[in-house]
Amino acid sequence: MKDLTDKQQAVLAFITAIIKERGFPPTIREIGDEFGITAKGAYDHLKAIEKKGYLKTAKNQSRAIELIRQSPMESLPVQATSIPVIGQVAAGLPIFAEENIESYIPVPDEMAKGNVPMYALRVQGDSMIEVGINDGDIAIIEKRDIARNGEIVVALIEDEATLKVYYKEQDQIRLEARNPKYKPIKTKKATVMGKLIGLYRIY
């Protein structure tokens, strides 16, 4: 049996969680809705997972999914939501555009607040090390376009996303690092793309 991609792992974890929760698998449409893809896209993921020996599907039956092998993420909490890991946040594109998404990861439902969208962003650099955010960490972000002073946010400046502490001043926005090597960024053109609510670290 071959290894699954990150997205295939997330799909398999979702199927496993639904079966445990209600006793039967999700439909292809439900899988598509969960991951923001078409029914055909969901079906293609199922067939790829089936080829790797993790499940069986039956033709012409929307719920005919049988698990053969447990998901590699089975040790994670069952009540979990898959969120996209955004490779880049670019101006002019929806943040969840397919071309922005590099993989998916599960997060506990306790992190979620109702239906507020979330995404993850890979941290680059050491500008936030004094608050325990290191290079390579995965920041869990609640999508929003407003922030309060002192919150850690993802801000888009031109075509570059940065994770910084937000302060709104009279005629500008100040974005502060938490590393004395870096000076504050002062700008009138920053766009808030979300607020930090959690952190994943891979050892």
UniProtKB/Swiss-Prot annotation:
Site (Cleavage): 91-92
Any GO BP: negative regulation of DNA-templated transcription
Catalytic residues as annotated in Swiss-Prot or TrEMBL: 127, 164
Keyword Nucleotide-binding among record annotations: no
Reaction(s) this enzyme catalyzes, per UniProt: Hydrolysis of Ala-|-Gly bond in repressor LexA
Keywords: Autocatalytic cleavage, DNA damage, DNA repair, DNA replication, DNA-binding, Hydrolase, Repressor, SOS response, Transcription, Transcription regulation
Residues annotated to bind DNA: 28-47
InterPro entries from the UniProt entry: LexA (IPR006200), LexA-like (IPR039418), LexA/Signal_pep-like_sf (IPR036286), LexA_DNA-bd_dom (IPR006199), LexA_repressor (IPR050077), Peptidase_S24_LexA (IPR006197), Peptidase_S24_S26A/B/C (IPR015927), WH-like_DNA-bd_sf (IPR036388)
Transmembrane region(s): none
Superkingdom of source: Bacteria
E.C. code: 3.4.21.88
Gene Ontology terms: cellular component: protein-DNA complex
A GO molecular-function descriptor: sequence-specific DNA binding
Family per similarity comment: Belongs to the peptidase S24 family.
Subunit structure, interactors included: Homodimer.
Function in brief: Represses a number of genes involved in the response to DNA damage (SOS response), including recA and lexA. In the presence of single-stranded DNA, RecA interacts with LexA causing an autocatalytic cleavage which disrupts the DNA-binding part of LexA, leading to derepression of the SOS regulon and eventually DNA repair.
Protein name: LexA repressor
Organism the protein comes from: Leptospira interrogans serogroup Icterohaemorrhagiae serovar Lai (strain 56601)
